[in-house]
């Protein structure tokens, strides 16, 4: 090999090594969290006073992820009680063309989660099963269209963002350690509603090209009536009932989200 060619080869190889050793700086992450009370942090007992009835707090998984990864910007507009229409008509205003990451958790309130829990708490086994079946019919027939509209609105407002949708855990360990409270028939019915939500939400997220985080496995062994609960049972304030507690966000939702997003 002639000296000039040899020198050129050395320079080229050195440049490649330098490029590998000094990768381009990662693009800044501008993160917006959307969703309902599971995303806002209701159930953790710690809330930002300025969030009012939305009950957003620093111990919710979006805030925990932001604290762990230090994105360039972070804003949560998740709100207790939010339905798909609230995301479309209100929360998506927080998105822009500069948004690079969106997490979204919604659908439980559309499906009547609160009424299901109320019916199953105060009604008979058959009342509970009937109400869950009614919810599952809604989830199968109506919720997919609502989710499609919501996901389309998110994509329209944040065309370049990575969007990750999060699901809901099963609520009860069946059979479990609880000697009082709901029957196993009721607990199993409620869990079947969680599975129906998973099926609908994961399918529509995939159809939209969004990521999906299934937290049912993460919460396995940590449901209500397990030996280590990551969800509140009937609690005070009552609105915190049947929501992830601090451990549920820190040890359940956060690792599941990081496994998908990093």
Regions found by a protein language model. Give the residues of each.
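Serine-esterase "nucleophile elbow" of acetyl-processing enzymes
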Residues: 27-78, 93
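Oxyanion-hole/transition-state-stabilizing segment in secreted/luminal serine hydrolases
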Residues: 42, 86-139
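A short acidic, glycine-rich active-site loop
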Residues: 50-59, 126-142, 185-195, 239-241
